[in-house]
Amino acid sequence: MTLWINGDWITGQGASRVKRNPVSGEVLWQGNDADAAQVGQACRAARAAFPRWARLSFAERQAVVERFAGLLERNKGELTAIIARETGKPRWEAATELTAMINKIAISIKAYHVRTGEQRSEMPDGAASLRHRPHGVLAVFGPYNFPGHLPNGHIVPALLAGNTIIFKPSELTPWSGEAVMRLWQQAGLPPGVLNLVQGGCETGQALSALEDLDGLLFTGSANTGYQLHRQLSGQPEKILALEMGGNNPLIIDEVADIDAAVHLTIQSAFVTAGQRCTCARRVLLKSGAQGDAFLARLVAVSQRLTPGNWDDEPQPFIGGLISEQAAQQVFTAWQQLEAMGGRTLLAPRLLQAGTSLLTPGIIEMTGVAGVPDEEVFGPLLRVWRYDSFEEAIRMANNTRFGLSCGLVSPEREKFDQLLLEARAGIVNWNKPLTGAASTAPFGGIGASGNHRPSAWYAADYCAWPMASLESDSLTLPATLNPGLDFSDEVVR
């Protein structure tokens, strides 16, 4: 029984699904997808639970969420292992995901009050008030790269605001999704407030097609996000929050400490085996001897990165990708770039057949025409050379995406110029692109999405503002507008 609907664990009526560790092949989870009827059942449960949940005081909803935070803390070790085994990422990195999940809850509580709480301004004849109200029933689509942390960034603010939810985790991480839902159950969440439907494309399409849905919160690929946007077009009554990918540029200008710059680049491009939406996909490197030295050092250090299993000791920097198919797709993308005329500096290697272990790849594309503006979601870094900083900014902005952008340079003036001209939601200076804080907006523009699914800014799309003019008594104004006559005379 792997679906959680209206407080009950039930068996899916859709296709069967098996999840294996992407490196060892160990079977981790087995179950069945939710069919369209069960998706509808989850929606009805959420709709029925909404009035009571929304009418609870904020303190009562907060108490449930804080109990969930306590359960995360107490079950940190077990949940870390589940996420690591299912995604293939090393234990050390899965542990950082749990820490982020826990920390985000307190930030979400504060954000509710600061960004979407209640405000009152006194007026001579009354008051002007601002309140926020929940949308109703929201669908949350989770990604596979951070199957606990990223859905949590939607779910917690949505619940705090008073919404009820239907959650569909990625079909590649059903075990993590189920494990987190069982903690919500232990936290005492009332039946129907949060519902879990497992499944792939068919389940997702049934969920997004629900008429009685008030909104959809999505983190994932641009292709899926575009499909959802088209599906919900013409329905302005539904909130749609999209956080998608990026073809992110990292500008390497003047470098004083080459090893520090190489470390920043590896953290930007290859952490999580390149499976972060903010990962650097393009290095824009200033032409010259210093750029040559940086590139040689980057290749030398990157070729030492050997992916391993989640529990290897000593721990590897990167693990496997989410699946063997995902690793093969990245490898094929490198082959296609090479066939277009790219110059391979570090060839990626599929280490073992039947696994997702893939070493990083680096390929220079300077002067190659027609390179696709696509996100390759894995450890593949493309390099272009530039001559002037203005050219670097033009190259950085030459993408339909707009998620993250970074600059390595000692010159504050160049960063100030980049801040003015960059088309990206995240612009960093001498910091990895993959660093993020839950107190800052996380998201981008263009094909990278619209709203900002972090603990702080998620409050904005989880509730709608209600403005009120109020007075505890009704009196006739002392001065009336022209043309109004309230005298006792009878007009003949």
UniProtKB/Swiss-Prot annotation:
InterPro entries in UniProt? Ald_DH/histidinol_DH, Ald_DH_C, Ald_DH_CS_CYS, Ald_DH_CS_GLU, Ald_DH_N, Aldehyde_DH_dom, SuccinylGlu_semiald_DH_AstD
Annotated GO biological processes are: arginine catabolic process to glutamate; arginine catabolic process to succinate
**Is-annotated flag, keyword NAD?**
yes
Q: Where is the active site?
A: E243, C277
Catalytic activity annotation: N-succinyl-L-glutamate 5-semialdehyde + NAD(+) + H2O = N-succinyl-L-glutamate + NADH + 2 H(+)
Which positions bind NAD(+)?
G220, S221, A222, N223, T224, G225
- Report the protein's function: Catalyzes the NAD-dependent reduction of succinylglutamate semialdehyde into succinylglutamate.
> What family does this chain come from, according to its entry?
Belongs to the aldehyde dehydrogenase family. AstD subfamily.
State the protein's name.
N-succinylglutamate 5-semialdehyde dehydrogenase
Q: Which organism is it from?
A: Escherichia coli O157:H7
